[in-house]
């Protein structure tokens, strides 16, 4: 192959695999970051790697579905229905609660909008976020400690790296 388009982030292209593709000139990935690609090996082998503008709706939609499922006890309720029981409980409300967002980039901003639509107070923190930038999307900037202390729901939207690994722990 001269060109390969990688559609899944989990498809590994390590040095061994890249060496088995001697005619490969271009490796295209959905999104701008793909940890499964060995960029150093690709460069050493003369393979150009580039990304596309990612589809930014899937992650926020899945995030919101998981928040709703956890808050409303969806799995327990679905299992009760399957067992012939009806509505064991309503779960908790989101309206009036605080949504904390760690990482207010494009995905975090979309999740913030979902929270706002549901009547949640939305707060955020990340290392490069400013109060002014947060205010542009009607979000309140807080410290990391305030974020963890005040959030009823904490949603993390950071690239996993050495800098972000372990950022949320028991001390947070």
Predicted regions and their residues:
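Alpha-helix boundary recognition
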Residues: 18-22, 43, 82, 95, ...
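Residue-level detector of flexible, active-site-proximal loop/helix-junction positions
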Residues: 34, 56, 81, 129, ...
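N-terminal glycine-/charge-rich "phosphate-binding" loop or analogous flexible N-terminal tail
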Residues: 1-8, 119, 132
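Phosphate/diphosphate ligand-binding glycine-rich loop within oxidoreductases
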Residues: 3-78, 92
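A short, charged, Gly/Pro-tolerant segment at domain boundaries
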Residues: 80-88
């Amino acid at each position: 192959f001269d060109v390969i388009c990688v559609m899944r982030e989990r498809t590994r292209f390590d040095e061994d695999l890249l060496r088995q593709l001697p005619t490969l000139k271009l490796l295209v990935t959905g999104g701008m970051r793909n940890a499964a690609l060995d960029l150093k090996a690709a460069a050493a082998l003369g393979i150009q790697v580039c990304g596309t503008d990612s589809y930014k709706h899937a992650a926020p939609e899945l995030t919101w579905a998981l928040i709703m499922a956890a808050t409303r006890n969806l799995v327990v309720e679905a299992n009760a229905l399957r067992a012939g029981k009806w509505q064991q409980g309503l779960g908790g409300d989101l309206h009036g609660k605080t949504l904390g967002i760690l990482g207010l980039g494009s995905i975090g901003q979309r999740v913030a909008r979902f929270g706002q639509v549901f009547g949640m107070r939305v707060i955020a923190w990340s290392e490069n976020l400013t109060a002014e930038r947060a205010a542009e999307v009607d979000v309140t900037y807080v410290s990391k400690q305030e974020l963890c202390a005040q959030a009823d729901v904490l949603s993390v939207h950071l690239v996993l790296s050495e800098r972000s690994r372990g950022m949320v722990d028991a001390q947070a």
